[in-house]
Amino acid sequence: MVVRLTALLGISLIFAGCTSCIEFDKQTMVFRHYPKTDTLVIWQQYEGIHGEGEGDELSDEEIEQLESVLQGQRTFFFANWIFEYDGKAVKQYIQDLKKELKEGAADKDPAQPRSLIASLKLLQKSIDIYNVSFYLNKQGQLSAAQQVTLRNVSKHIKAANAFLRSLIVIGELDADDEFTQFLLDRSVENELEYITFEGQRLRVQWPMSAKHFKQLAVDEDVIKKFTQTGGTVKHANGSLWVEIGKVQSADTTVSMRLSDAEFKNNAAEHVAKRFGIDRKFDPAKARAAFFRESDQHFKK
């Protein structure tokens, strides 16, 4: 269920432990939503890129991971290889769903995987990820920038909300907490929009009792960092609320340090030889240029 849910949202969850991974110490994400053209553009900056494994050079596994990002449609969301959009994984998941349907192994209602396939195909057509450049930040650490463009935003959100309701109906998201289950069932009856995007504000609302919320094993440090960057995580009116951005803002910025560990300068040499490092790259100027160009294309 988790895989299906996150696939619909365009996000992969990777739970397998990784003893030798490419990591980044800080991420800055700036997004601008264009409601009239139903488009979202995102500027991604990853700073302090390095290999987590031992040694002064990247391991074969880390090199393979780096290659997969540069050659594929992948972008990350504040958790180093845990939350990401992976175009290759989405393609494979579509193939797996088609195989299930062909073999008659789709669970319960075949309409659900068919709808999911259609949504994922639309997502594939709607998203573009461009790897801009490797560069060195002010601390001399290996860093990189990406540009992401997502079209048909409202269709993706509508599909995600409908899919969440369908999962509640078939019992995939049942809660042990009795009152939370009541709230979930009522949200289906009321056709609650769990995910909304208004102006530059992204909001997620999930039915949950106050008791259930208090029992959640949430990393307080992560919440603190998220709120410091302007986000909100709270429980109110029978729901968990996660919110970032303001409706009338020009755009929304989320910048978080993901690690306080000592930086390992073990990736720059390989990247310089394999891909090149733009030592004159100015991320602030490049970001401004990206949004100017986006305004010209999508602002109406």
Named regions from a protein language model:
Residues A79-K300:
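Mature, soluble, non-transmembrane domains
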Residues C18-C21:
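N-terminal Sec signal peptide cleavage junction
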Residues F24-L116:
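N-terminal Sec/ER secretory leader and immediately downstream segment
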Residues L9-F15:
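Gram-negative bacterial Sec-dependent N-terminal signal peptides
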Residues T6, D25, N131:
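Sparse, context-dependent recognition of short Cys/His-centered cofactor- or disulfide-binding micro-motifs
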Residues M1-L9:
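Bacterial N-terminal signal peptides that target proteins for export
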